[in-house]
Amino acid sequence: REQIVDHASHIIDLHTGAIHRTNLPQIRAQLTPGGETERMANAFGAPVILNAELREGSLRHYAQNRGIPVLTYEAGEALRFDEWAITPGVRGVLRVMRRLGMLAGERRRRTPPAAEIANGSSWARAPIDGILRPQVRLGARVARGELLGRVADPFGNAEGEVRSMADGIVIGMSRLPLANEGEALFHIARFDAIEEAESAIEDFHSSLAPPPDPLY
């Protein structure tokens, strides 16, 4: 950290989801209204910004304590090349670099899709051990109490429902067909303006239609 982080003026930390867990493209950062971190997050252009507390020992925690603005970009799944996660990540990094004056501006300026800031998130967990049958997709808007999936034991003796604990957007989910009781299955982000968040995700997906040069 001392050899790299201490010499940085701005940081973007690139992450996938865990193994067998996928994430909707999102920015995680501790935001201060009008601060440099918030300006970076808005410039990046991910559909969701999660205003996340710092974790002790993390890169974000280390950098923030030294006054270095830092974003974490989370998208896709570990051990996978997901174009829908990689392309917006590359575009977002380039947008931030242009905003910082590290790169020249675009010849044909494109406005990034507007992002919505989530005011919190939580995981819906498996009620029992068994086989998971998801009922929603990544990026879906869900209502409090809505059915997210069913978990049934292989012999059909028991079945449990996984329901959303809040109105929100599914920003992460398990890809494993098997679930253990208490395992995190669906990550739900909460928004003050849920309609705007849903619209931001739709605009984001529309923006992924490749232009002649998908990166520049």
Name these PLM-found stretches.
Residues 1-216:
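Structured catalytic-domain cores with a bias toward divalent-metal coordination
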